[in-house]
Amino acid sequence: MSLSLEFFILSGAPKAVERFTESAAGATVTVVRRETLAADVNAAVAASTADYVCVVDGDGVLAPGALATLSTFVHQHPDATVVYSDEAVKVRGKRRPATVAKPIFSPERLRCQFYFGDLVLYSRALFTELGGLDATLPGAELYDLALRASLVSSSIEHISSPLFVRPVPRVIDLDATAVASTRRALETHLAASGGGEIVSIGVDGVHDTRRLVVGEPLISIIIPSRGIHSVSDGVSTCYVLDAVRGIVEKSTYTNYEFVIVLDSVAEPEVVEELRLIAGDKFVKVDWNKPFNFSDKINLGAIHARGEYVLLLNDDVDLITPGWLESMLALAQRPNAGMVGAMLYFGDETIQHAGHGYYENDASHIGLDADHDDPGPLDGHRVEREVSGVTAACALMPTAVFHEVGGLTNLLPGNFNDVDLCMKTTWLGYDIYWTPHAELYHFESKTRDASVHSSEVDIAWGRWSFRMHDPKYWPYPHNRPPG
């Protein structure tokens, strides 16, 4: 099987062009000028007879066997109109390059960064349908093409093999022209994909773009709590009071209610103070059984009036005032099932940037990383699709919560959120994560956090066949390989 493919490589150092051409032996390679990139490529594609075209803007070469891999892949995926792959970077002192793994097609992530990389194949038919590269967007032509393709292509495919090898890590440093072009490209994309706003364009290629909330729907914040004071580090505190007070004082979104499921041991003065803090937003639900987080959440959902339910632990402290807007805007996406937040431990390290399921392991993305750790491919900095999120802070459309059956009471303390996420994606819904909803989470300060073997047996008994799900986070133990 041969692949009908034409590469267009930007003119640069003659040796770099020569190295790439040698690595692409068997395919047509045409050199184009950066100054007239769009015009040169569009004219060349118009004259081309290749089935696929690829513009290479980077110093690197195809990995050995890359063309054969691409050929096999497109023959196995004849409907693919966009194909991109993992990459590799040579590391000084090491024989093998380091792999730069990428997620599968992630539309919300794409509006925040052009993560496709240097090797992106477009079917010539799609390239022509899109009108080719836009000459009015110098410095952002390739990103703009990917954004436009994402709105019309029904098959954007990822090859989880490093087919492009760079001699050094790619460093993105957009000049003023490229920043302006990127802004215009993203403005057009957001307008065509449901709306949104651009907070900032990053010269490093990471852009703060956000969806916008439609209307002002009621959010029911469901908080299971014992409702008592406890001593932590020698100080008596009541976590649910602190959590509710922080939300009331800091949140910029105000159409919410607190559905607080309180144990029978709840202190009367705590209940009274909750009423004082939350006023008519406070809904008290009584709980008279042994601890079961799942059952308490489900009971709270029965009493919830909101169009959306926010599952929330009582041992949290809000950081970002606009957290509800950031989560709600994603929860309003057409196929949204759940949205998670960025959680930090009290020592400022990351606790949660999404769930990662890898090689039969379920764990938190970013666990124990430094507060400002950007994550592999800047994954801690961008809104993105994920395989799951923690129920310590998760927003769901109420209808979806009930459709999936809520949380299973067979998992009273652990892995109930894993099960909930699995059920949500099993029914075809998308799960998102945002770094713009930030909270401290004082991990299980008010309950026994031990994991029981029965919980492992139940969760893995149900979902072990899906406990390797590297689509959106392709890193073992949620760390990049290296």
Q: Language-model features: where?
A:
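C-terminal, non-catalytic tails of nucleotide-sugar-dependent glycosyltransferases
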Residues: M1, A176-I219, D347, E359-V386, ...
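Short, acidic, metal-binding catalytic loop of nucleotide-sugar glycosyltransferases
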Residues: R19-V31, V240-N255
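Glycine-rich, basic loop-to-helix element that forms the pyrophosphate-binding segment
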Residues: E35-S48, W287-A304
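Short aromatic/hydrophobic "clamp" motif used to bind/position activated sugar donors
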Residues: V53, V309
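Conserved donor NDP-sugar-binding/catalytic core segment of glycosyltransferases
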Residues: G65-P97, P169, V316, T320-N360
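A recurrent flexible, glycine/aromatic-enriched loop bordering the glycosyltransferase active site
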Residues: R96-A125, D295-K296, Y358-A399
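Donor nucleotide-sugar recognition loop
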Residues: G131-L147, D317, E383-Y440, T446-A449
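Catalytic donor-sugar/metal-binding loop of nucleotide-sugar-dependent glycosyltransferases
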Residues: L147-R166, E187-S200, R210-R211, N409-P412, ...
